[in-house]
Amino acid sequence: LGDVYKRQILESPWFALHVSSLLFAYASFAIACVIGITYLLLFKELKAKHLGVFYARLPSLHILDYMNTRAIAVGWLFLTVGLIVGVVWTSQEHVDGTDPRMQAMTLLDPKIFVALFCWVIYSFELYAHRAMGWTGRRIAWLSTFGFAIVLLNFVPIGYFLTSSHNF
């Protein structure tokens, strides 16, 4: 009986939209992390007045900061869409009490909880940039921290702790 539900879930049009939007969000966050780390390395090089090969081949700090915040904004948008689609999709499924995977799709599922935590982190990052004027190193560090949480959601939580997202 569980295989029937699994097949229905994987064949749902909501599945493709949910997964693709979340993967695009996580890819955007990965790009933001790389840009953030690049920003931090370039900042360190400039502060030490050691302008080597690394400096000559990179855009300015201002452009890196701009690229970082844009990657975060795009990722946040797709993360929001993916989470909303997941909620709508779950609410439309007619859950029979026999499938524990469907029963586990609540906020108590570690993967869902951490995905919402990622949304809070990146929401704060966008808020801090727009309302509090945070730029540069602060945003770069937040991008790096946020992506570390994304990786946490994929590796240990995705493989060992969640039950509803294992297909």
Which residue stretches match the model-derived regions?
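Short, small-residue-biased leader/transition segments that mark boundaries at the very start
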Residues: L1-Y5
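Short aromatic-rich membrane-water interface segments that cap or initiate transmembrane helices
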Residues: Q8-A25, H62-T69, R101-F113
